[in-house]
Amino acid sequence: MGARGAPSRRRQAGRRLRYLPTGSFPFLLLLLLLCIQLGGGQKKKENLLAEKVEQLMEWSSRRSIFRMNGDKFRKFIKAPPRNYSMIVMFTALQPQRQCSVCRQANEEYQILANSWRYSSAFCNKLFFSMVDYDEGTDVFQQLNMNSAPTFMHFPPKGRPKRADTFDLQRIGFAAEQLAKWIADRTDVHIRVFRPPNYSGTIALALLVSLVGGLLYLRRNNLEFIYNKTGWAMVSLCIVFAMTSGQMWNHIRGPPYAHKNPHNGQVSYIHGSSQAQFVAESHIILVLNAAITMGMVLLNEAATSKGDVGKRRIICLVGLGLVVFFFSFLLSIFRSKYHGYPYSDLDFE
């Protein structure tokens, strides 16, 4: 039965082929070649992607952050295919660039990359790289980048969006802040492991030893503990430190200042009310101390019972300190809160 059915099926297939239009054979041949070409192109893409990932994993095995020039940047970051996210720090670490902020940011970036490399969650979906200005000037020009350091996320597909550029000026460059930003952009959560830092412990031990030694040497005369002036000075120092934003600096880790790479101008005051530099805190601390000194002199001139001429001089000096430095402080406030209507002496 099966032997008799086979010839009949072949005859039916032959009849169907005879009824096909004559011009359909070139079309079928073209369609077959197109399918073969598409299959070959897809295989080529897969092989190219595998080679790129293998190369990136090899670099990552040697160091957590690999440096890139223009050619490597275009091949591994800009050119498809990609199935991985790339975090890139654009920086200027050469000594002649004199970018102290770049060195500080690089230390935090290294801590973050090492935390990812040695974590149990490490995989080939996220890599860390660096482009130095002196090694990839063409990359800076291609991206129209005019400041360093800058952190960018390049997603597996498509172009980077605005949120893929880390807001360093507002958030700071602490490794923990970078890890939060990366988790938001890639859904990869990195637990930051910092190397042990014993400087705080050593400083505390030295302070305790110094205080203990002082108390031991003065054990027969401890009246200085009840000195109101000494405790007032200590309290003022704490108040000046806290009102100048030192705690914000400790939490956010902002740069000390910002140097414009084009004209070399250094900014010590941040132009936004949402951020500040470390130098800005030092300036505010000095201004607050000077204003306080002026108020103390005014109080001394009003309450003391000395020579009238001397009291008048003290009063003028105190008034000058308060007016001058408070005007300076107010001008800084106006530069950060644009549109603030009040001012004293104009320093702008």
Swiss-Prot record:
Matches recorded under InterPro entries:
OligosaccharylTrfase_OST3/OST6, Thioredoxin-like_sf
* Superkingdom, natural source: Eukaryota
Disulfide pairs? 99-102
Q: Which residues form the signal peptide?
A: 1-41
> What Pfam families has UniProt attached to this entry?
OST3_OST6
UniProt-recorded name of the protein: Dolichyl-diphosphooligosaccharide--protein glycosyltransferase subunit TUSC3
The family annotation for this protein states: Belongs to the OST3/OST6 family.
**Organism taxonomic ancestry:** Eukaryota, Metazoa, Chordata, Craniata, Vertebrata
What is one process in the GO biological process aspect for this record?
magnesium ion transport
- Stretches of the chain found on the membrane's Cytoplasmic side: 218-221, 298-312
The UniProt subunit note reads as follows: Accessory component of the STT3B-containing form of the oligosaccharyltransferase (OST) complex. OST exists in two different complex forms which contain common core subunits RPN1, RPN2, OST48, OST4, DAD1 and TMEM258, either STT3A or STT3B as catalytic subunits, and form-specific accessory subunits. OST can form stable complexes with the Sec61 complex or with both the Sec61 and TRAP complexes. The association of TUSC3 or MAGT1 with the STT3B-containing complex seems to be mutually exclusvice.
Where does it localize?
Endoplasmic reticulum membrane
Name the linked condition: Intellectual developmental disorder, autosomal recessive 7: A disorder characterized by significantly below average general intellectual functioning associated with impairments in adaptive behavior and manifested during the developmental period.
Q: List residues traversing the bilayer.
A: 197-217, 222-242, 277-297, 313-333
Tissues and organs where the protein is expressed, per its UniProt entry: Expressed in most non-lymphoid cells and tissues examined, including prostate, lung, liver, colon, heart, kidney and pancreas.
Q: What is its main location?
A: endoplasmic reticulum
The UniProt keywords, alphabetically, are: Disulfide bond, Endoplasmic reticulum, Intellectual disability, Magnesium, Membrane, Signal, Transmembrane, Transmembrane helix, Transport
Entry GO terms, CC: endoplasmic reticulum membrane; mitochondrion; oligosaccharyltransferase complex; plasma membrane
Q: How does it sit in the membrane?
A: Multi-pass membrane protein
Q: Pathway involvement? A: Protein modification; protein glycosylation
Give the originating organism.
Homo sapiens (Human)
